[in-house]
């Protein structure tokens, strides 16, 4: 199937599947097959923020006064988050847009990816405000084995989907010889690559950020590195929305009533999908041990974080129809919820530091029924 940026072939977008149908031609939003994506777009747009709005002058003083083990925790998490959002700032667009078939999902993916670029810009804003030479931090990211071991498991699923999709668009289905290697391209393989990639992205949004989030908020609970925590809170709010997006995509694919023709793919990939979750949770536990190798911090240690990883892994897997792999427990760090539930608060923006302010939240649609009790 040859990809085109604008198909002249008329089609009914309400009858197209989310993926592998006809390429989107007219980006129309008056009719939508899955209006959940429109709601996600509206929510993400209302969340718009810039890292420069947050004052980090006190954070520099706080960072200089941190003991060496806490500096290691703080900087290591920033390195890892920078890498994750560097991947997420480009990969959803490259991997998913060429195979998307409905405009609302296409626009959600573009909106999602754009917000990820704000996150990666935020880490630069934080690092250059607390360290004289940011290059010391950034140059270590690629060479740090503890970071790259985890990143590899994320990028491999994106890369495989991108590679197979490129062959499909260029050569079509069939058996091909590429660089002296035999390659079979078919829709079944493409669907498998898509589903596993979506699972991997869901795991990234669901689990991989939360060790870093917990550490940032633990610092702020002690009233230090508070500017950083305000930025991370905004990032966490966005990531929760992105997680909701991938959960909806996966649950739509899982539901036979939606005619997405993914039933067999979901069943065939189930075991591997579960392994992706379990592997990610084990990697995050390993990361927690790496962070706390030189000592714990007040209110948080590797054991508590490992319990938290199991707790959120259970919740995330259950949300997309998988069994909970770990013993069901309560949240070992319940105080984190006040940091993660910030989008429910609406505050007046007298100060630039307000981290829960939403824009574009006026309801402009009014029906005739709204005036039925009015008398003139």
From Swiss-Prot:
This one is known as Ribonucleoside-diphosphate reductase subunit beta
What keywords are annotated for this sequence in UniProt?
Answer: Deoxyribonucleotide synthesis, Iron, Metal-binding, Oxidoreductase
Its biological function?
Provides the precursors necessary for DNA synthesis. Catalyzes the biosynthesis of deoxyribonucleotides from the corresponding ribonucleotides.
Q: Where is the active site?
A: 123
Cofactor binding, per record: Binds 2 iron ions per subunit.
Positions binding Fe cation 2 in this chain are 116, 205, 239, 242
State whether it acts alone or in a complex, and with which partners, per the record: Tetramer of two alpha and two beta subunits.
Family assignment from sequence similarity: Belongs to the ribonucleoside diphosphate reductase small chain family.
Record GO terms (molecular function): metal ion binding; ribonucleoside-diphosphate reductase activity, thioredoxin disulfide as acceptor
The record's listing under PROSITE patterns reads:
RIBORED_SMALL
What are the binding positions for Fe cation 1 in this chain? 85, 116, 119
Pfam families in UniProt: Ribonuc_red_sm
User: Which reaction does this enzyme catalyse, per its entry?
Assistant: a 2'-deoxyribonucleoside 5'-diphosphate + [thioredoxin]-disulfide + H2O = a ribonucleoside 5'-diphosphate + [thioredoxin]-dithiol
- Which EC numbers characterise this protein's activity in its record? 1.17.4.1
A GO BP entry is:
deoxyribonucleotide biosynthetic process
Cofactors that this protein relies on: Fe cation
């Amino acid at each position: 199937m040859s990809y085109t940026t604008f198909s002249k072939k008329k089609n009914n977008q309400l009858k197209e599947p989310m993926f592998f149908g006809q390429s989107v031609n007219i980006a129309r939003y008056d009719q939508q097959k899955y209006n959940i994506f429109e709601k996600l777009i509206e929510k993400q747009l209302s969340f718009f923020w810039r890292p420069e709005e947050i004052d980090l002058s006190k954070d520099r003083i706080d960072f200089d006064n941190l003991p060496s083990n806490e500096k290691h925790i703080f900087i290591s998490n920033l390195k890892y988050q920078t890498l994750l959002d560097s991947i997420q700032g480009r990969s959803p667009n490259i991997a998913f847009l060429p195979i998307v078939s409905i405009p609302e999902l296409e626009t959600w993916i573009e909106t999602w990816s754009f917000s990820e670029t704000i996150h990666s810009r935020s880490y630069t804003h934080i690092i250059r405000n607390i360290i004289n030479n940011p290059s010391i931090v950034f140059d270590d990211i690629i060479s740090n084995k503890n970071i790259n071991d985890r990143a590899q498991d994320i990028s491999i699923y994106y890369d495989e989907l991108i590679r197979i999709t490129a062959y499909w668009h260029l050569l079509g289905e069939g058996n091909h010889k590429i660089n002296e290697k035999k390659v079979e391209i078919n829709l079944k393989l493409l669907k498998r690559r898509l589903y596993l990639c979506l699972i991997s992205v869901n795991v990234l949004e669901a689990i991989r950020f939360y060790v870093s989030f917990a550490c940032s908020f633990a610092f702020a609970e002690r009233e230090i590195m508070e500017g950083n925590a305000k930025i991370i809170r905004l990032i966490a709010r966005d990531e929760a929305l992105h997680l909701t997006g991938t959960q909806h995509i996966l649950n739509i694919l899982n539901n036979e009533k939606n005619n997405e023709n993914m039933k067999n793919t979901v069943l065939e990939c189930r075991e591997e999908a579960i392994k992706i979750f379990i592997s990610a949770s084990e990697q995050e536990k390993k990361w927690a041990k790496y962070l706390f190798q030189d000592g714990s911090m007040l209110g948080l240690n590797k054991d508590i974080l490992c319990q938290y990883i199991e707790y959120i892994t259970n919740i995330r897997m259950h949300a997309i129809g998988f069994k909970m792999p770990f013993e069901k427990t309560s949240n070992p760090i319940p105080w984190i919820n006040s940091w993660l539930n910030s989008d429910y608060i609406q505050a007046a923006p007298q100060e630039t530091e307000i981290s829960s302010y939403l824009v574009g939240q006026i309801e402009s649609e009014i029906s005739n029924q709204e005036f039925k009790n009015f008398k003139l």
